[in-house]
Amino acid sequence: NIKDTFDQKSLLNPHKIVKPYKLDDRQLLRYKPNYKTENIDTRFDWSNWGNFSDAIEMCNNNGACRELNDGVMCPSYRVTREEKDLVRGRANTLRLALSNQLPKNSFVSKEMFKTMELCVSCKACQRECPMGVDIAKMKSEFLFYYYKKFSMKIKDKIMSNLPRNIWILKLTSPLFN
């Protein structure tokens, strides 16, 4: 280093020329050496990303999802302006749960449901995120496990079975029209 050679005591331009980290320095890495995620059996095929956890980790926190002026990025965030309702917030919450940085069983919890519930599954995140993070698909994966543990609300049961039971509505439509 030229500065170290000519200015060993850092008297010339103190704090103006700094010693950068080496590019392979572990401090620059996003995840610590002991970082690992829980591997869960998923309903969707996540092999394009490696696995479900790897797909979540595609979020690199670049903040493009905070865009309020152009595009359609995350309508729920545009309304609430809260980080938990942001694509990045949801992805990070999922990542923290699957890497056991949140309390045990956080992945399938009421708190995680609150984080995911305002996602309207419009897939704007997948289209507009530079990394293609698909929170709508991740929400579906989460809901599969959530509803195995907690029962579905009646409105959710009706909507999820609508294609199967549409004939009932057709028969009763004269009563409502």
Predicted features along the sequence, with ranges:
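Long, C-terminal-biased catalytic regions of enzyme "large/alpha" subunits
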Residues: 1, 88-91, 113
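Secondary-structure transition/capping motifs at alpha-helix termini
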Residues: 4-12, 66-68, 84, 100-107, ...
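Ferredoxin-like iron-sulfur electron-transfer modules
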Residues: 38-61, 99-121
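Iron-sulfur cluster-binding cysteine motifs and their immediate structural context
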Residues: 14-16, 58-96, 124-143
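A general structural signal for short secondary-structure junctions and capping/turn motifs
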Residues: 2-4, 48-51, 56, 62-67, ...
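Polar, glycine-rich mid-to-C-terminal structural blocks
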Residues: 1-54
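Iron-sulfur-cluster electron-transfer modules
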Residues: 103-177
